Amino acid sequence: MFNYGNANEAQKEAISATDGLVLITAGPGTGKTFTLVKRAVYLIQECGIKPEQIMMATFTEKAAKELITRITNELAERNISVNVNEMYIGTFHSLCLRIIKENLEFTRLKRNYRLLDTFDQKYLVFRNFHKFKNIEGIDELLSKGGSWKRSDEICTYINHLSEEMVDIEALQSDDNPGIRTLGRVLSVYQEMLEEGNLIDFSTIQTECYKLLMQNKQILEELQDKLQYLMIDEYQDTNYIQEQIVFLLGAKHHNICVVGDDDQGLYRFRGATIRNILEFPHKFENEGCKIIPLVVNYRSNSDIVDFYNEWISTTSGHKFKFSWDRYRYQKKIEPHVKSDIQSPAVVKLFSKDDEDEWHEKILGFIKELKESGKLTDYNQLAFLFSSVKHQRVTALANFLERNGINVYSPRSDMFFKRDEIKLALGCLMLMFPKYVMKLEKQEFDFLQVEHYRYYRECIVAANEYVTRADNKELLQFIRKHGKAHAGLTGTTDYAYSGLLYKLFMFRPFSDILDTDMSVGVVDIRPTRNLALLTQIIGKFEYLHRVDVFNGSYIDRNTELLFNLYLKLLYDGGISEYEDEAEYA
């Protein structure tokens, strides 16, 4: 008898419904991850399915790691010894990349290909913008602005076209001149990818789909092997992802999708709610079992009641049409009726005085802690429309100054952290020619904000290295500054090597010696320094900088600070996100 644990009746049905098409409509907080974990274990324990015969696609890498960890733990508790890593678990992009890697010789890619992230892609287009600016009709396609802004627009077009599997030849032969321009843009970009042995996130899925469609044997082998497919967050899938799912599941038809049509958030990325609404009708003459999960285990009844009232209002003057026909009817139920007298959500505001607002929030938090309603600050969450807003980051800084650590890795605070400003300042001091030009504001590409930031970095570095207990660091910086200023030959190091040498000195050595088992906020400086080395290393790779040469050191240094780091600064960088509890 399979042990379902604390599963409710609907969850038990979803866990044991293994064959054919299964649609699990999972409202917020209804235990969908719990259900998926139990379902995978059920397939292995009760149905005798091997891990490599199961594919589970999630929306984020973090969700994939959580699935792997929880499935591994669940199997261990049942004394079932299998290698969970043999399962196809990951995001659509990572799963497609795995299929590509396993069959690389059948793709356009060669060994040692490079995967572009979002910034890499934009930077590639920016550095090759001359190839696009002469395309007929490009000025009508793009808005006015600088090359970086227009490169971003080009990438947006490219990604949408790639993920919708639009045919380039059809674009280029279209009667509409604007469509023909798009076709030429996509053609030029794909030529760049092929020449550079590159692949980006939007083309991973396209390359995988082409591989499967053009190689019948590979497709049939995968169709034979992958007997059970489970797709999470199905409401956020796009056209090409849907095509890949039904291509891989075409033989066994054992496809289970989990999602909530009321939580479709990613239309701007090409996702379509149509996928989940039309899923039950995908295979003719085959039924689809629809299992709604409606018991919410996360929120109290006040929040659930508000949600039900809000989400069920589908017509009225605020709506362009009645959209109740475009959703699965459901009513979420709280697991336990709330007996908490205090409100779950509190709004704290002041009219215009930011200092008063800060003090009011700090006082409220301290009151919660002192009364015992909070045992740990991580039980408190702040909701903002954007964590990157200046008002929000100012609040975070205020709370941290008052002893309350804040975890907000996506607030783009990377370049504002003390350890990063000090490291960049020390690095700049070792290139005195660059610092001299910076002081004279001789760089056209830098704006007032960038000059101000780099000056702050240099001031922070100067103040630190001139302290009496930092003589060795000061000597190190002066020695390399003198060497770089008069360099005529070639060194045996470049920027990343210089950074590693710098990290031998305090405070960087102390930061890197931090015990990694401490809290996420305590290891943030360590992670940030590690990220900085990756950023500098990527610059060296992109610009083929292995060593310093007297002929190129000044130009490359200006490229590093005035272009590469400047663009990263403008775009913002997320900090390390804690995934310690996952595999």
Protein language model regions, located:
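P-loop NTPase Walker
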Residues: M1-L109, L115, K216-E220, A250
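Accessory N-terminal region flanking or inserted into the helicase ATPase core
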Residues: M1-T25, T30, F34-V41, Q53-M55, ...
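Conserved RecA-like helicase ATPase core segment
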Residues: F2-N6, K12, Y42-Q45, R127, ...
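ATP-hydrolysis module of ASCE/P-loop NTPase motor domains
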Residues: A17-T18, N83-E86, E105-I199, L226, ...
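Helicase P-loop NTPase motor core
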Residues: L23-I24, T30-L36, P51, N285-K289, ...
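Conserved helicase core region in the C-terminal RecA-like lobe
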Residues: Y88-R98, M230-E233, V258, L563-A583
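Conserved short internal alpha-helix adjacent to the catalytic or cofactor-binding core
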Residues: I99, S342-L348, G363, A394-L395, ...
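Accessory C-terminal helicase-associated subdomains
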Residues: I179, K373, K471-A583
